[in-house]
């Protein structure tokens, strides 16, 4: 082993020691294993990342006495072992919560050995770069760097390639196919021909994987800063169509003579554009960038954020186009109403993937509303009432819609002879946001001009849903700045009542 690798192994050893010292949960696990003379191995991703000089918060241990160890640690520390994988018997050690205490910095999982030894276990893992183990029991005795690497994972990390541990690695668990592309992107690896061959041979088995596991891996991919490049690789190798069959009709669907990209490639380009804007969000939104980032970071389900669902919406925003394509008398191609059909298709896809109701509604609404900023952009100057109605959607929708619009615009510009001039886009979005913050947002604090009692008395109504309908209409007019006084509000209510009756 060369000097560079020895230096890296020294760093790995230091990382392991810092890990043990920096976590009460882990130090207790190590001490309990030592006292009971149980074997204990640190495995997988933490070691891979430590070798590369990266941090990792997910820590995995294995032991032939995993169940006994978990119980002993729980007794000593008050941690709660929670079963998270029934198939492999993996438990997560949840530390007790103490007031004013600093939280556990790591997520700690403990699993039984697969097979009769640590080497059997490592051979059953997915990829060689993950088939690493650090012998904690041996380290306790001499504090040495007891790294086990039976499949050459360190060499593969050095060479930047992703190899499977065995011929059956992917067929045993086809979800590892998606993980392969995610690892390639995250660590800048290459897929050797043999690995790609294994992927193509096993990808038909993806339909045997539980939908929830597919969903989790897909959302992990979308949460990556380079999700577009991962999806392109999956697409080129024919894997993505197995995961998102609803998108097959978007392929090879030409949009117009001026737009060279067909619908599916345009959607992937829009996702790339979104990732560009997320990386350069201040350039697009200026002083408003922090507010947008706060909204996008909100969690919709578990650890899945609004931003991750926005990426899915960008990928699906034109999913309705194959069903609304028409050709005018002059030969122009139209997709009238594709956002309505697309919203329904996007909702069905989200339901199939078992996304939460919040995620499903969010993605569906973004697809349904994605043409609104486009229509506003085409009007010069932008009508204030139309702009007010757009912002009436609320920050949880208008921020993602602005980013979806910007991404759609950038992808369109780059696919035409117009080029990639984004200055008009930046200026219009800044103007819209100035209008919102200077004129609309202050109105959010204004109380209603009239009450339901006022309407009942003035219009001689009895309490009914009509009163609520009138109040909602007046609130929208007040938001738009169309009514400012009590007299104006009551007169408008009378006109609306006459109109509706």
Map each language-model feature to its residues.
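Catalytic cores of the polymerase beta-like nucleotidyltransferase superfamily
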Residues: 1-501
């Amino acid at each position: 082993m060369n000097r560079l690798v020895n230096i890296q192994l020294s760093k790995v050893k230091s990382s392991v020691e810092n890990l043990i010292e920096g976590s009460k949960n882990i130090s207790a696990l190590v001490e309990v294993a030592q006292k009971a003379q149980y074997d204990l191995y640190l495995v997988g991703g933490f070691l891979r990342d430590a070798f590369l000089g990266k941090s990792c918060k997910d820590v995995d241990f294995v032991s032939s006495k995993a169940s006994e160890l978990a119980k002993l640690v729980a007794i000593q520390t008050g941690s709660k072992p929670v079963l998270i994988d029934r198939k492999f018997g993996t438990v997560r050690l949840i530390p007790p919560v103490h007031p004013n205490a600093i939280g556990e910095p790591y997520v700690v999982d403990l699993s039984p050995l697969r097979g009769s030894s640590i080497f059997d276990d490592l051979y059953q893992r997915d990829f060689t770069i993950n088939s690493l183990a650090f012998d904690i029991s041996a380290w306790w005795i001499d504090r040495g760097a007891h790294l086990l690497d039976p499949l050459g994972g360190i060499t593969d990390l050095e060479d930047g390639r992703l190899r499977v541990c065995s011929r059956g690695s992917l067929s045993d668990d086809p979800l590892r196919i998606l993980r392969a592309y995610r690892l390639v992107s995250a660590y800048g690896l290459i897929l050797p021909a043999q690995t790609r061959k294994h992927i193509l041979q096993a990808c038909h088995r993806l339909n045997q994987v539980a939908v929830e596991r597919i969903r989790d891996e897909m959302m992990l991919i979308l949460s990556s800063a380079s999700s577009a490049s991962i999806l392109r690789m999956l697409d080129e190798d024919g894997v993505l169509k197995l995961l998102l069959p609803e998108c097959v009709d978007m392929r090879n669907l030409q949009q117009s003579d001026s737009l060279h990209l067909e619908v599916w490639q345009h959607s992937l380009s829009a996702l790339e554009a979104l990732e560009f804007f997320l990386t350069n969000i201040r350039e697009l939104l200026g002083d408003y960038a922090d507010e947008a980032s706060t909204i996008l970071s909100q969690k919709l389900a578990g650890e899945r954020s609004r931003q991750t669902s926005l990426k899915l919406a960008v990928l699906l925003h034109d999913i309705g186009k194959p069903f609304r394509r028409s050709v005018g008398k002059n030969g122009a191609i139209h997709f009238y109403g594709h956002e309505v059909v697309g919203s329904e298709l996007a909702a069905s896809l989200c339901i199939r993937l078992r996304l939460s109701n919040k995620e499903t509604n969010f993605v569906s609404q973004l697809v349904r509303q994605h043409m609104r900023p486009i229509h506003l952009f085409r009007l010069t100057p932008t009508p204030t009432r139309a702009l007010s109605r757009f912002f009436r959607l609320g920050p949880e929708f208008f921020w993602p819609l602005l980013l979806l619009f910007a991404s759609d615009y950038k992808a369109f510009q780059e696919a035409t002879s117009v080029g990639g001039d984004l200055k008009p886009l930046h200026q219009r979005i800044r103007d819209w946001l100035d209008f919102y913050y200077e004129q609309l947002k202050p109105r959010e604090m204004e109380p209603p001009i009239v009450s339901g009692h006022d309407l009942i008395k003035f219009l001689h109504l009895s309490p009914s849903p009509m009163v609520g309908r009138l109040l909602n209409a007046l609130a929208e007019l007040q938001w738009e700045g169309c009514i400012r006084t009590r007299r104006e509000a009551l007169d408008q209510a009378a006109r609306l009542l006459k109109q509706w009756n």
